[in-house]
From Swiss-Prot:
This is Large ribosomal subunit protein uL24. It comes from the Bacteria. GO terms for cellular component: ribonucleoprotein complex; ribosome. Keywords: Ribonucleoprotein, Ribosomal protein, RNA-binding, rRNA-binding.
Amino acid sequence: MQKIRKGDKVVVLTGKDKGRTGEVIQVMPKEDRAVVRGVNVVKRHQRQTQNQEAGIISKEAPIHLSNIAIADPKDGKPTRVGFKIDGEKKVRVAKRSGEVIDG
């Protein structure tokens, strides 16, 4: 079970976007990276195609998983993730507050 999943609210811990929060759009476990909405935005030069014109577009680049942390559901501050068996299910738990992380 992954600690960070698509749809999670995360906080950036280091880098140019330190302190910003966003939603995980995509997780790449083999590269240990994730794409977060509104974070690590870069400019890309787009070549003209049949259905898209040329120009410079902004898009989110992947960020390393070590540089982001799950936002605590209680107060939104960064927290580590633990696991707990809840009945028959294994659930993710915020170490900071003990709250179950939805997912």
